[in-house]
Amino acid sequence: MPLSASLPSKNYDYDYDSVQPYFYFEEEEENFYLAAQQRGSELQPPAPSEDIWKKFELLPTPPLSPSRRSSLAAASCFPSTADQLEMVTELLGGDMVNQSFICDPDDESFVKSIIIQDCMWSGFSAAAKLEKVVSEKLATYQASRREGGPAAASRPGPPPSGPPPPPAGPAASAGLYLHDLGAAAADCIDPSVVFPYPLSERAPRAAPPGANPAALLGVDTPPTTSSDSEEEQEEDEEIDVVTLAEANESESSTESSTEASEEHCKPHHSPLVLKRCHVNIHQHNYAAPPSTKVEYPAAKRLKLDSGRVLKQISNNRKCSSPRTSDSEENDKRRTHNVLERQRRNELKLSFFALRDQIPEVANNEKAPKVVILKKATEYVLSIQSDEHRLIAEKEQLRRRREQLKHKLEQLRNSRE
């Protein structure tokens, strides 16, 4: 059910009921959705549980806001300044709303359902559906703008109020209306608490309880700062698949009359540009074996390639050296084994020779090395004692010889 923002609704009690969305989409949009699913050449076939979403397409409805016109109906018969400003805002706000949002509320809910399905099930088909829906809505909106442009320019503004009534009645009614409006706004429920996602950017922020009621009418709209616009652009670059770039600046003046404000408050429209942002969607196949390949940017890839080339060169240089080193190690091992075998053989032969020199174990071929060493030690000690004894005997014999020589000389001299 499209929302008509160009004509103001006089019955404000039922105005909020009229904007409640239907539970299901219109037949036309469902046919488009089914047709988009049946075309399987360019789009991915739907997920097995994609049709279940039709049962869950009801939007959460917040409780109705309190009436804003109950006390004003019997208070005054003439529109006050606040009423006139609100009517002008509604008349001029339609173009701004249609300019900033291509789809009407039902179409917005349809697009959001596609986005929800994109997040949960089919990533490729939902992107193409969303792109087609936005393109069609853009074409219809531009056609309606071209047809309705001259008519909107020639349409006169709301009739100015008649001669000023006595100051007591309108002032009292305006003050009463502002008071009721402030109380109603304080009693309203913030839609962000009820809705899981923001419906649109035109939803006003919740006013603090002590705010001025005149500021709640939305007479002046402060321009968005550069930081907010940069944050919105960053969010759009990160999330959106189709982005609408538009530059519109609207300035409203409350000091002039209603006709002058209508002439000055017409926004300067710029042509809408439909940007197609390519989003890389990688679906991970959990059944496939894990791949160790990692993709890097161009600069990092060049660095890695150069590093790999250097590593390959160094590896090529080292390719021959491991072989030579292995051969050298094998040669060293062979020579070491040969030398060790020779040493053991020599040691065995020396033990055999030592065993042959010891009389106690000379005939024992199975004598262990420890026994051979012990017997050899004992034999060496005995030989040393024999040596000392023989040396002492030799010394005695030498002295005896000297004595005998001396006696022989004495005998020779005595005979002469």
From Swiss-Prot:
Cystine pairs: none
Gene Ontology MF: a single term: DNA-binding transcription factor activity
UniProt superkingdom: Viruses
Sequence ranges of Acidic residues compositional bias: 228-240
Compositionally biased region (Polar residues): 315-324
Region (Disordered) residue spans: 144-174, 203-268, 315-340
Any single Pfam family the record assigns to this protein: HLH
Gene Ontology annotations for the cellular component aspect, listed alphabetically: host cell nucleus
Biased composition (Low complexity): 212-227, 245-259
Keyword GTP-binding tagged: no
UniProt entry tagged with the keyword DNA-binding: yes
Entry keyword set: DNA-binding, Host nucleus, Oncogene
Cellular compartment(s): Host nucleus
All residue ranges annotated as the bHLH domain in the record: 331-383
Predominant cellular place of this UniProt entry's protein: host cell
Sequence segments annotated as region (Leucine-zipper): 390-411
Bias (Pro residues): 156-169
Further details from the record: This protein is synthesized as a Gag-vMyc chimeric protein. The sequence shown here corresponds to the Myc homolog fragment of the chimera.
Function noted in UniProt: Transforms avian and murine macrophages and fibroblasts as well as murine B-lymphoid cells.
Subunit structure: Efficient DNA binding requires dimerization with another bHLH protein.
Protein's UniProt name: Viral myc transforming protein
Lineage, opening ranks: Viruses, Riboviria, Pararnavirae, Artverviricota, Revtraviricetes
